[in-house]
Amino acid sequence: MTLFTQEQDGLTEESYKPKKLFTLEEANKTLPLVSRIIGDIVRVSSEMQSLHAEAERLAEEGRSVRAEEVRGRFEDLADQLTELAEELNAIGCVCKDPRVGLVDYPARMHDRVVFLCWKRGEKEIQFWHELQGGFAGRKKVKGALG
């Protein structure tokens, strides 16, 4: 199972079968919980990046015992990250970028499936994008859903 993915090339409505399609209202109602989970994901992801760099530095210095301790902590954090991603998946949304807290919610717009797109720090969902659009293709929700 892919927990986080920024890759959307080739994603089509025929190939993508979400377990739930959200309305804007439904997705916004999940934000208090999703925001807490994403906060943890961003924190754990950041700590993992730091530990990875530290483990490489320690290995280069020949401090293998300490490097193994750091690797062990890294693996614990990876397990936490998996659990957090599974919590999001259970809600029906997916984290697209654990470093900044980018989340997509599958939704139906007119006759097609799209993603409602939320980024950590935003008070509500204000953007959407096509399945293959990604963050760079975000458009304002206001007036688009109907």
Predicted regions mapped to residue ranges:
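Phosphate/adenylate-binding "loop-and-lid" substructures adjacent to NTP/NAD/dNTP-binding pockets
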Residues: 80
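Metal- and O2-centered redox machinery and metal/ROS homeostasis
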Residues: 2, 83-86
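Amphipathic alpha-helical coiled-coil segments and their boundaries
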Residues: 20-23, 30, 37, 63, ...
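Long, hydrophobic N-terminal alpha-helical segment
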Residues: 1-57
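Glycine-rich, aromatic-bearing surface loops/beta-hairpins
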Residues: 86, 90-146
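Intrinsically disordered, low-complexity segments enriched in polar/charged residues with Gly/Pro
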Residues: 7-9, 74, 102-104
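Heptad-repeat coiled-coil alpha-helices
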Residues: 50, 54-57, 61-64, 90, ...
